[in-house]
Regions:
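Short, flexible, surface-exposed loop segments at domain boundaries
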Residues: 1-14, 18-160
């Protein structure tokens, strides 16, 4: 993964563009049971997972990247993509139980954790200076190509 760098990528007519935007915490209820989410986290002092950012997936993306694995948002960070199977109020926020591929994790989400979501976008939303995320492969011409670009709205950095 490349962060904060630059790259020239090829987008076809079919390349999907989506916005990543911040959800207003006061307007959003706690993540519902059975909702698909992706949570970037860091280990706490006792090994517990503490959310850095929570991405609420659209239903069409359920299962995307499902699992628990190292991430590069910051040194030592982890990503857990799964389904919310439980939520409990704790002194430091809300503890979410996530299930994925026959396993599960509990992650504490503090009130100040970033909460973001995706929405469909247009190519016009891709502007110079906006933060983007994409996964790319080399095409037959040796150029980087992608089928989806996620662009941050209003300065939001996509959490991927």
């Amino acid at each position: 993964m490349m962060h904060w760098g630059s790259a020239l990528i090829t987008c076809s007519q079919d390349t999907e563009v989506q916005l990543c935007f911040r959800l207003a915490k006061m307007l959003v209820p706690p993540p519902r049971l059975m909702r698909a989410v992706g949570i970037a986290s860091r280990p706490g002092p006792n090994g517990e997972l503490r959310a850095i950012e929570v991405l609420v997936f659209p239903e069409a993306m359920r299962g995307a990247g499902e699992g628990h694995y190292p991430w590069d948002l910051e040194p030592g960070s982890l990503m857990t993509n799964g389904t919310v199977t439980g939520t409990v109020e704790v002194t430091s926020g809300r503890e979410l139980s996530l299930s994925f591929k026959g396993a599960s994790n509990k992650i504490t989400v503090a009130p100040d954790a970033a909460l973001v979501a995706f929405a469909p976008a247009e190519r016009a939303d891709l502007k110079v200076g906006e933060r983007v995320f994409f996964s790319a492969t080399k095409n037959s011409e040796g150029k980087l190509a992608t089928s989806r670009v996620t662009v941050g709205k209003d300065g939001v950095a996509p959490p991927m």
